[in-house]
Swiss-Prot record:
GO terms for cellular component: plasma membrane. The gene is mscL. One of its GO terms (molecular function) is mechanosensitive monoatomic ion channel activity. It holds the Pfam family MscL. This is Large-conductance mechanosensitive channel. Channel that opens in response to stretch forces in the membrane lipid bilayer. May participate in the regulation of osmotic pressure changes within the cell. The lineage of its organism: Bacteria, Bacillati, Bacillota, Bacilli, Bacillales. It comes from Bacillus cereus (strain AH820). HAMAP family: MscL. Homopentamer. PANTHER family: LARGE-CONDUCTANCE MECHANOSENSITIVE CHANNEL (PTHR30266:SF2), MECHANOSENSITIVE CHANNEL MSCL (PTHR30266).
Length: 132
């Protein structure tokens, strides 16, 4: 599954990119809220009350807010995983539809129709010879 995710994330397919942008925009706020309001506090409890967003290194009056960076990476990973799962389900449904189309009996070609007519004529000739 990891290899599939890497292929998905790094291939240059325009449709996958478009789907990712649309789905990412649609679910971005929901996933961000999930991460910010549910997952991060749970991780904070497990890790001893750590809140990633407040993590920083202070140099005098300046601060490096690396906690926000960790939070942003975490948001990205969850959004990317959600998009990946959506595309995987979409591709699976699409491939099932294609398999169903392949199972349908195709219309006979002109050659097949002509060969069928020749077969029928030969049967008629053979049956008329048998009667005579």
């Amino acid at each position: 599954m990891w290899n599939e995710f890497k292929k998905f994330a790094f291939k240059g397919n325009v449709i996958d990119l478009a789907v990712g942008v649309v789905i990412g925009a649609a679910f971005g706020k929901i996933v961000s809220s999930l991460v910010k309001d549910i997952i991060t506090p749970l991780l904070g409890m497990v890790l001893g009350g750590v809140d990633f967003t407040d993590l920083k290194i202070t140099f005098g009056k300046s601060s490096i807010m690396y906690g926000n960076f960790i939070q942003t990476i975490f948001d990205f990973l969850i959004i990317a995983a959600a998009i990946f799962m959506f595309v995987k389900v979409f591709n699976k449904l699409t491939s099932k539809r294609e398999e169903e189309k392949e199972e349908e009996i195709p219309e006979p070609t002109k050659e097949e129709e002509i060969l069928g007519e020749i077969r029928d004529l030969l049967k008629q000739q053979n049956s008329s010879k048998d009667r005579a």
